[in-house]
Amino acid sequence: MKQKLCLHGLEVKHQAQLLNLVKRLQPSAIVKYKTKEKYFKDNDMYKCRVARFSQAAAPYLRVQCAWGVLLVCDKLLPVADITLEFDARVPEAVAEAERLVQRFLSSRLKFVLEEPSLSLRIDQLRGCFDQKELSAYDEEAAQSLLYCHLPWQVYYVNKLWAEVLAKGAERPLMRQLRVKLRRLRSLLTFCKPLLPEQEATEWQRVLKERTNLLGDVRECDVLLMTCAKLRDAQGEQAAEQLTAILQKRRVSAASKALKGQKLNKQTLELAKLLLWLYSAELTESSEQTLEKFLQQRFGSWYNKIIVLPEKYPDLHDMEQMHRIRIKLKRFRYALQSIPEVGAEPKLLRSLKYMQDMLGLLHDNYINNKLIEALVAKYPKISELRYESAMFTGWEQAKADAALEILPQQWETFEELLHDWKAKRL
């Protein structure tokens, strides 16, 4: 099967930068130039100059450079792309594609992975993207999940890495990056029966490792948000010492998380993930239709979720509650990433509410431990003990309220889940 992998250049000043990069790696290639333009409704359009490189010695792989603009919602966006088209069934083609990607990403130019089709890129920017429009989409093939659904999650992660590394460890960006990494890992877990188990497990480990890098920053952000609420409720002097300590801790955690991180390094890792997805030898499960695989896989996850209260009955055991939250979060991410299953907004809202309530309980549990550790670390700051007591009291009140309504919320969620299963599975 022919696959495409697109590297979108950031801050590329001239087309010659892209052309020279490719020419150095393919000096014997024949180059043909063509201008492409297409117009859409609402005055959207794209226009670009495309250079196609072809080599007789490697007919299974072609490279093209595109330079131009997209006009979307009256905004001009640059097109500065290097796209590789290769036969994923030919090992030599995949190996050569990986070699070229590594060489491109070792240059001074910065790249992110992007959707190769400019038309679909415009749809995505307008918020009307439909995965069924992708050429690789096939309702009769379960592997459509690998070629259509997973790549878009990869693109989101890569673009957020670009924003984080350009703008710094801003709280909203760090949170979004962590969420997108978790969503990518959840969808990969969902698709795991289609893939070689050992390699899929290794990629799960890699994505978990990347997510965990951001964990300390997230913990500090949660604590600082609670401190901000305390100040709003009780005045600017509330939790003053605790806030100062946490801000320093947050700076240190962010520096540690981003130390040594380079955009092209992240892009290369994610490009390798895509190349593996495109070329992996699939299991027998891939012979199912997409609908049958989705029914089977979501049915299996449904069966596991419905027995969670029996498996983890102790509402006061925060480790058990955390395990429930992880499974609910993974389920919600899969539902959101696969529109074919038609998850109703009510179900998604209920899932999110359950996840937030369980998250509040777990945050309270973790925060109490962190606050205790800070008090022990700074015994000479007398105000800290008072502020920590005020902090934990504030958090505990919210946790107690969440714990009280949790059984009722689970009943509501369970009803919605049953209804969804009856309609969709």
Regions found by a protein language model. Give the residues of each.
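Function-determining surface determinants
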Residues: 1-425
